[in-house]
């Protein structure tokens, strides 16, 4: 019977998110992430195989976190537009490193991300419905 994993993928991704928000993506390496968690580099390599695997999973994790910062709104078009803009502004002002990583530095990944498309589609569909009334 194998040992139970103590450093989970969730712990690694959450720690990396906090490092990103605090220090920016450039501060995140396998070694610095392991040091922040207080473990060897082995759990990170085991979960993600390499930095490319980590980056892909981390990008999706950051998108999910960014999405959680948007208010779900079912009111008027004006209110929906306001709340959507407020979500972007809140992230840009309060978590500029996260905003830069998700929406600026990774434009190509952002365009190809199903999660980002869903984030944009959720509000876009509501906006289109309200415009058609």
How should these model regions be labeled?
Residues 11-18, 22, 53-79, 83-90, ...:
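Alpha-helical structural segments
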Residues 109-133:
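Amphipathic alpha-helical packing segments from all-alpha helical-bundle domains
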Residues 11, 15, 19-53, 57:
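Helix-turn-helix
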Residues 1-7:
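N-terminal intrinsically disordered/low-complexity leader segments
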Residues 91-114:
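Amphipathic alpha-helical segments used for helix-helix packing
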